């Protein structure tokens, strides 16, 4: 059974189960029984005794309605909340257990979010089916027992339905999702690039292709839907013919109105129960499939617990070798490097020389078991590599993705508490005050900022974090890339000033040539993976 389904079952409350059973018995057995009794009395002209079963019928329907309004729906919504948060917790724990470099890859994978959504809605749909349609199962059991006791001959006919129902449940939709996905991906590519085609006078051509793609999608969908409907209706027709044949036998053997009504209702119940099992099984299959996808995207990896160093004065790197898993490229230290608090260090090298990977190692993103090292922190050899300093560093990546549809105040503060003084200081040092002041920071939406302004807001967030966290190491990967030269120089000078005054070891790479000319304590050259 799926781990997520087991997780879901653990959230089932006793109250929901009890009310489902009571409601199922009332809806599926008592109410139909009362209805049949009233029908028999009407046929027999026994109007005198109609009041009692009729009052009981109304009472049962009242009980069923009250249960749904005040109990079942409440329990079900609570269960849905627990399931949704439980699935989120399950996936978050799997993500948290991964090494950070794998986490980065996983979180950039669109399939993760897609699989998670399918899992959530498949599970919720499965619970809806089992709770709201459970009365069909109770009815099926009750009516089967009645027929077994009162009409065992006709039950043999219903046995013929078993292979039909099993076949219906096991039936796999002939639609291949990859066909739909391929067509839809073609449409998305055309749609996302249509502006460039329009401004280069290819608008009619691209729109014709988009319309043609949609037409192909709809033709494929229509063909598959018709084929599936033919199958479903054929199964329903087979069930209907068998139940009607059974009714004919009932009329020939025992022409009794009550028996006839029960057999007639049982035919409908068989259809409903078959659809119940079919829908539940398919949702379960969807759940299993997407859990396999999740498990492939999020493998279970036991990460070792690395003891953290709270403070240090120096880091001596005697050996460092990191081999890329998918290429022959290798990062290797040429000669020992010694780093100290308050130092400002520039990594210099062309694109592709390994600067970002070296920063990933220093930031602890790449786990220590993936590279060879000999590192001393304050003359003490560490077995955890740079991961021992994870809690003492701030890392600003080059291609970090951000949610820009957020107010500047919330973007800058992040998970830190708000401080007006620190906010003012951060906006000033990041040169943001020409487009957002301290008074406007709560009402300025970042999505409306230009590319350069977004770059400065990101630097304001970094400065805010530095002041709040007071790290020992600051790692900056080309944070000046989106800035004009004069702004880049001014902002980096401010960052250097903060680092020197707070004894922060700053390791950075720069995009702007003027920034590279600033006063650095050490420049580490990097060339084709060779450090130093």
UniProtKB/Swiss-Prot annotation:
Keyword Transport: yes
S-S bridge residues: none
Subcellular location: Membrane
Domain ABC transporter per the UniProt entry, residue ranges: 315-531
A single MF term (Gene Ontology): ATP binding
GO CC, one annotated term: membrane
Keyword terms of this UniProt record: ATP-binding, Membrane, Nucleotide-binding, Transmembrane, Transmembrane helix, Transport
Transmembrane segments: 11-31, 51-71, 126-146, 147-167, 231-253
Residues that, per the record, bind ATP: 349-356
Topology relative to the membrane: Multi-pass membrane protein
A Pfam family that the UniProt record links to this protein: ABC_tran
Superkingdom field: Viruses
Protein name per the record: Uncharacterized ABC transporter ATP-binding protein/permease L733
